[in-house]
């Protein structure tokens, strides 16, 4: 009787030590205590069934709460790398991975490559002195202008934007516009009262091409600086109006270069001067924004 009473006292003391919550939780030590407690409880289960079952219930509660605290993500683990290989953060300003494509030859990029490949065809058909040469040149330029809008729309709508496409798109636009301007300057426009005027299209062409070269260099420099400079050179509504008038003017001039319709040629030349003025104006606006950022 004395030995059995002493054994029950030892079991009760061990159970109380086990059930006492410790400030620092150690999983191996806690596991060893559970094993020892289960051994003692199996020996004394016939004498103290109610007390042991109650202690085991409390023991399982503390074990589950401790393991849940260990499995709960801490503040340091919230900033760990996610499954996509990107650092998780609370900033929602960055686009989700599905908005950009890892493929190089997406549909918008193929359309952009088609514009680059159309530049030699534009040059070849421009020097064909016939009506179908004029029609082919104008059709190629119109198709390039349409795909310029279409590839950007598809990249946003279908989430097929890529870094290669973002680099190639402005290059294709500048190649097409610069080639068309140079081609038009090689064949002076005939004005009935004044005869050929070789400078009529040369002046706005120099302004437009010079502006595009300057903005390309400025954007390349801004990309290597802070984010505020990139915001300063972002495309604005003035640049969109410049592009619209530029494409319209070049289409009219290509379609009417062998035509005797004076007002059509004059309207195309007038729109080209408007486009040149908008180009210089937008360049001044960009430079003013950049100057404000640099002076802060």
From Swiss-Prot:
- Compositionally biased residues, Low complexity: 62-82
Q: Name one Pfam family in it.
A: CDP-OH_P_transf
Annotated membrane-spanning segments are 104-124, 126-146, 164-184, 189-209, 261-281
The entry's description of pH dependence is: Optimum pH is 8.5.
Start and end of the transit peptide? 1-39
The alphabetized UniProt keywords are: Chloroplast, Lipid biosynthesis, Lipid metabolism, Membrane, Mitochondrion, Phospholipid biosynthesis, Phospholipid metabolism, Plastid, Transferase, Transit peptide, Transmembrane, Transmembrane helix
Ranges for the region named Disordered are: 62-103
> Which BP terms from GO are recorded?
chloroplast organization; phosphatidylglycerol biosynthetic process; phospholipid biosynthetic process; photosynthetic electron transport in photosystem II; regulation of embryonic development; thylakoid membrane organization
Pathway given for this chain reads: Phospholipid metabolism; phosphatidylglycerol biosynthesis; phosphatidylglycerol from CDP-diacylglycerol: step 1/2
Q: Which InterPro entries match?
A: CDP-alcohol_PTase-I, CDP-OH_P_trans, CDP-OH_PTrfase_TM_dom, CDP_ALCOHOL_P_TRANSF_CS, Phosphatidylglycerol_P_synth
What is catalysed by this protein?
Answer: a CDP-1,2-diacyl-sn-glycerol + sn-glycerol 3-phosphate = a 1,2-diacyl-sn-glycero-3-phospho-(1'-sn-glycero-3'-phosphate) + CMP + H(+)
Q: What is its EC number?
A: 2.7.8.5
- Cofactors required: Mn(2+)
Null phenotype? Pale green stunted early flowering plants, especially at low ambient temperatures, with impaired photosynthesis and abnormal thylakoid membranes in chloroplasts; requires exogenous sugars for growth. Strongly reduced photochemical efficiency of photosystem II (PSII) due to impaired energy transfer from antenna pigments to the PSII reaction center. Enhanced PSII complexes susceptibility to photodamage by red light irradiation, associated with manganese ions Mg(2+) dissociation leading to reduced oxygen-evolving activity.
Cellular localization per UniProt: Plastid, Chloroplast membrane; Mitochondrion membrane
Could you give one GO CC term from the UniProt record? chloroplast envelope
Instruction: Enumerate the GO terms in the molecular function aspect.
Output: CDP-diacylglycerol-glycerol-3-phosphate 3-phosphatidyltransferase activity; manganese ion binding
Q: Which Gene3D superfamilies match?
A: 1.20.120.1760
Membrane topology for this entry?
A: Multi-pass membrane protein
In the record, the note on similarity to other proteins reads: Belongs to the CDP-alcohol phosphatidyltransferase class-I family.
Function, as annotated, reads: Catalyzes the committed step to the synthesis of the acidic phospholipids, including phosphatidylglycerol (PG). Transfers specifically a phosphatidyl group from CDP-diacylglycerol to glycerol-3-phosphate to form phosphatidylglycerophosphate. Cannot catalyze the phosphatidyl group transfer to inositol, serine, choline or phosphatidylglycerol. Possesses high activity with CDP-dipalmitoylglycerol and low activity with CDP-dioleoylglycerol.
User: Further notes on this entry?
Assistant: 'Jovtenky' means yellow in Ukrainian.
Q: What is this protein called?
A: CDP-diacylglycerol--glycerol-3-phosphate 3-phosphatidyltransferase 1, chloroplastic/mitochondrial
Q: Which organism is it from?
A: Arabidopsis thaliana
């Amino acid at each position: 009787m004395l030995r059995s009473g002493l054994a029950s006292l030892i079991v009760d003391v061990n159970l109380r030590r086990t059930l006492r919550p410790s400030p620092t939780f150690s999983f191996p030590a806690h596991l060893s205590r559970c094993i020892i407690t289960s051994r003692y409880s199996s020996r004394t289960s016939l004498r103290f069934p109610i007390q042991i079952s109650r202690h085991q219930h409390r023991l399982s509660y503390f074990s589950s709460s401790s393991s849940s605290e260990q499995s709960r993500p801490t503040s340091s683990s919230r900033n760990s790398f996610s499954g996509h290989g990107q650092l998780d953060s609370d900033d929602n300003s960055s686009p989700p991975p599905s908005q950009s494509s890892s493929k190089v030859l997406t549909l918008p990029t193929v359309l952009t490559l088609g514009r680059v490949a159309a530049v030699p065809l534009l040059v070849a058909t421009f020097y064909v002195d016939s009506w179908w040469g004029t029609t082919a040149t104008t059709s190629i330029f119109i198709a390039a202008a349409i795909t310029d809008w279409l590839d950007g729309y598809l990249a946003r709508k279908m989430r097929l934007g890529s870094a290669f496409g973002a680099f190639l798109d402005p290059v294709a636009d500048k190649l097409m516009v610069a080639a068309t301007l140079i081609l038009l300057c090689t064949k002076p426009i005939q004005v009935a009262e004044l005869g050929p005027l070789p400078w009529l299209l040369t002046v706005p062409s120099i302004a437009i091409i010079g502006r595009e070269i300057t903005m390309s260099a400025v954007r390349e420099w801004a990309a290597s600086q802070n984010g505020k400079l990139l915001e300063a050179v972002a495309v604005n509504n003035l640049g969109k109006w410049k592009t619209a008038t530029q494409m319209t003017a070049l289409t009219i001039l290509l379609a009417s270069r062998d035509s005797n319709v004076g007002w059509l040629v004059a309207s195309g030349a007038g729109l080209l001067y408007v486009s040149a003025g908008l180009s210089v104006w937008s360049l001044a606006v960009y430079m003013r924004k950049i100057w404000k950022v640099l002076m802060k």
